[in-house]
Regions:
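Glycine/proline-enriched, intrinsically flexible loops and inter-domain linkers
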Residues: 323-324, 329-753
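Flavin-dependent oxidoreductases
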Residues: 127-240, 248-259, 341-362, 366-371, ...
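C-terminal catalytic lobe of FAD-dependent flavoproteins
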Residues: 100, 200, 209, 223, ...
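Short Gly/Pro-enriched turn/cap motifs at secondary-structure boundaries
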Residues: 168-170, 193-197, 203-204, 264, ...
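Dinucleotide-binding Rossmann-like beta1-alpha1 core, especially the glycine-rich loop
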Residues: 2-77, 200-205, 211-213, 347-359, ...
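Central beta-strand plus flanking loop segment that forms part of the substrate or channel wall
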Residues: 1-5, 39-41, 165-191, 248, ...
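Flavin (FAD/FMN) cofactor-binding and adjacent substrate-gating region
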Residues: 20-23, 35, 44-120, 125-133, ...
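General small-molecule cofactor/ligand-binding pocket signal
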Residues: 67-69, 117-119, 263-266, 519-523, ...
Length: 753
């Protein structure tokens, strides 16, 4: 049980769990078997130590200790270890373990003390919706009615979800751990040994009485119950041991602990463990099913239980948790996460539980599920594809003679300069971007305009052909998302938002339709979109449209034809250059793409991947959903208050008004980082005169201005434009200057041309 996680907010939840369990004994008067002994993460390679450096900075940014240590320091606290092949490690002083049974009973006792009622040995047979909107659950002859259901059914989470015709992508896996006989060396110790995670050998280890308990993430992994549903009658039964599958893993464990060669094994346990397709918990309100929440998929269940319980209670009582949890929200999964996908992806990640998590890392299993019509064309042109919300989309393009694959790194990866060439090529001529994966919604009905004015911060456009950028805010003023609103007519609007935010946006919009005559249709799969931007974009598009792009102001839209193909053109540009988005029925995308590519040769057209777009937006100070745009950030803090109307009422308006009078202490700023520094990937700590004041949310190269850029979330009460700060990257300090946005084309002359 530990606080560290690849996601800082999950680390915060796990830290809460530790504090909760520490205080549980005092509240209920019984011990919960808490042992805070500290723990080492071992590194056998320089690459692993580089990851530890990255993680140390991340954890420092949120106030957690994570110190790099030498092999001799590890040996001094755990003398049984063979450290001869170690590069070093990391030390977590809050690492520990608890007795799961005692914690469970302790939490139940505390819950009952505070009014909870727990009904045991009651299997639910059916779940149905009542006319009142409440739920009816049956168990034999018993009937229960409730407003809220939380599916925390563990091994049976998928089956419970299927009772309401939805799905949770859980795969149950077999997992072994072993317990040794007493070891004289351990018995002779005066202090309990720290916990060990040998990340490169993929095993964990801790003291169990006077012996050791260890387990590994089996390379030859197996689905529990042969991939079938967990039996409803399953209790605490175990599976047959299959040590043949652990042979390679055990060899690595015995190498690390030579004393095991002469130690007996007194217990072998092969039990079930639930995995989500990305190894993270699945929590939150089920999209499209009001009053139904999910809390399952916990690999580190005990470590996460307390914090997730807090977040779920906030979600249910207040409508949202205090922390942004989109990385573990059930809305990150769509209908593409089938049972087959979940199993295939789990088989990939299970043996790699402790793998190095590199920036911009892509999975290889469960791919090519959702394809646009030009997918194969892009691959033939050198596209290295990534997966986003189930869709395949181009990350970058390998030129002729360059191998089309990612080489992962915390430094500048192999694609760095190629992404730069895409950005610079677009700025000199024009660029084509595949944008079909963006979320797209049709909002219709007699109250559509009124609805959009209520849920969005900006005044919704009233006339056809007008566009607005609007923020979706919660009552605390936190940003749920940002959308482009294109007015097609008075009662029909077309919304475009972030690829990863599709189900988040849809769930949020649907939750606020009460009292409005409005329909919301997720049209993401029905429409394709291609972006054309750069100084030659107008000339290219005019050549294919009888000069339809001459009189075409910024933030407007038109229905027109490109080489005879009907499109809706939106004058918006995420690159900050002159540009348009061309939206058409997805069946017409191939013809549109071919026309643009054939004619584009005359205008310097280059292909642009999502990684180049992610860097281009930094130069314009544009914010990204999931990085800068989160429910923890308000428009004033993000520098987006210009998109908040002062002439209408909308969700979050009170918070917006209050921040006009009292600006938030924390805000987002753009930093000009030392040009020789490694990239900022996110979560690097930021210092002012040696004092920690914030962390990086995202970063990259500003190719048009030749600057290394980062966006920082800082305590800005004493920080202004031009001030010098320091960013700690891989435990090295680099100078960073606070600059004003945008650094590229600050007067927007190119954008508004």
């Amino acid at each position: 049980m530990h606080t560290q996680s690849a996601y800082k907010n999950l680390s915060a939840l796990q830290a809460y769990s530790l504090r909760l369990y520490d205080g549980l004994e005092a509240e209920i008067g019984q011990k919960v078997g808490s042992h805070i002994v500290g723990g080492f993460f071992l590194a056998q390679t320089k690459k692993r130590m580089e990851e530890f450096k990255y993680l140390a900075g991340k954890f420092r940014s949120i106030g957690l200790e994570y110190d790099l240590v030498s092999p001799s320091e590890i040996k001094s606290k755990f003398p049984l270890l063979n450290v001869s092949d170690l590069e070093g490690g990391a030390w977590d002083p809050e690492e520990g373990y608890v007795d799961p049974y005692s914690v469970t009973m302790g939490l139940a006792t505390a819950a009952k003390k505070n009014g909870a009622k727990i009904i045991e040995n009651t299997q639910i047979d059916t779940i149905s919706r009542l006319p009142s909107g409440h739920w009816e659950l049956t168990s034999g002859d018993h009937i229960f009615e409730c407003e809220i259901i939380v599916n925390c059914a563990g091994f049976w989470a998928r089956e419970v979800a299927e009772m309401i015709n939805t799905s949770v992508p859980i795969t149950n896996m077999e997992h072994h751990y072993l317990v040794t006989e007493n070891i004289p060396t351990v018995e002779a110790l005066h202090n309990e040994l720290p916990i060990i995670r040998d990340t490169d050998s993929h095993f964990y280890l801790r003291q169990e009485n006077n012996g050791l308990l260890f387990g590994s993430w089996e390379k030859d992994c197996r689905a529990a119950w042969n991939g079938k549903s967990a039996p409803w009658s399953f209790g605490q039964e175990l599976f047959n041991n299959d040590l043949a599958r652990l042979e390679e893993n055990l060899a690595m464990i015995f190498h690390r602990l030579p004393e095991l060669h002469s130690t007996g094994i007194k217990q072998i346990t092969n039990g079930a463990i639930s995995f989500s397709p990305d190894g993270r918990p699945i929590v939150g309100p089920m999209p499209g099913v009001p009053g139904f929440f999910v809390a399952c998929g916990f690999v580190g269940g005990i470590a996460q239980a307390g914090g997730v319980g807090l977040a779920m209670s906030q979600w249910i009582l207040n409508g949202e948790p205090e922390l942004n949890l989109d990385f573990m929200d059930v809305a990150r999964f769509g209908d593409w996460t089938t049972k087959e996908f979940a199993r295939e992806r789990t088989y990939e990640i299970f043996p790699k539980r402790y793998e190095i998590i590199y920036p911009a890392m892509e999975r290889q299993s469960g791919r090519f599920l959702k394809l646009t019509p030009i997918n194969n064309d892009l691959i033939k042109l050198g596209a290295i594809m990534g997966q986003s919300n189930g869709w395949e989309r181009p990350l970058w393009y390998a030129p002729d003679g360059v191998e089309a694959r990612d080489e992962l790194s915390f430094q500048r990866p192999n694609w760095w300069e190629h992404v730069g060439n895409e950005a610079k090529g677009m700025a000199l001529g024009c660029g084509l971007t595949e944008m079909s994966t963006y979320g797209k919604f049709l909002i219709t009905g007699s109250d559509a305009l009124e609805f959009l004015n209520y849920v969005g911060s900006a005044k919704a456009p009233e006339r056809s052909g007008k566009i607005a950028l609007s923020l979706l805010l919660n009552e605390r003023g936190g940003i749920v998302g940002d959308v482009i609103i294109d007015c097609r007519n008075g009662n029909e609007f077309y919304l475009v938002g972030a690829t990863l935010g599709v189900l988040f946006y849809q769930r949020w919009l649907e939750a606020h339709t009460g009292g409005f005559n409005v329909k919301i249709k997720n049209a993401t799969s029905h429409y394709a979109a291609i972006g054309i931007s750069g100084p030659n974009s107008r000339a290219l598009l005019n050549s294919l449209s009888n000069n339809c792009f001459d009189e075409f102001p910024y933030m407007t839209s038109k229905d027109l034809e490109i080489n005879g193909i009907a499109c809706r053109a939106l004058r918006v540009s995420y690159s900050g250059e002159l540009g348009w988005e061309l939206h058409c029925p997805i069946s017409n995308q191939k013809a549109l793409f071919d026309a643009l590519m054939n004619c584009g040769k005359n205008y310097g057209l280059v292909l642009i991947g999502s990684r180049a777009m992610g860097m281009l937006r930094l130069e314009k100070g544009y914010r990204s959903w999931g990085a800068e745009i989160t429910t923890e950030v308000t428009p004033h803090a993000a520098g987006l208050q210009r998109f908040c109307s002062s002439k209408k009422n909308y969700i979050g308006r009170k918070k917006i008004d209050s921040e006009k009078k009292t600006p938030p202490k924390k805000r987002l700023v753009t930093l000009d980082v030392d040009l020789l520094a490694p990239p900022c990937w996110g979560d690097e700590p930021i210092f002012s005169n040696g004092e920690l004041i914030g962390y990086v949310t995202s970063g990259g190269m500003g190719w048009r201005c030749n600057k290394m850029l980062a966006v920082g979330w800082i305590d800005a009460s004493k920080i202004g434009i031009g001030d010098m700060l320091e960013v700690q990257i891989l435990l090295q300090f680099y100078n960073a200057k606070v600059i004003s946005d945008p650094i590229y084309d600050p007067e927007n002359q190119l954008l508004l041309n």
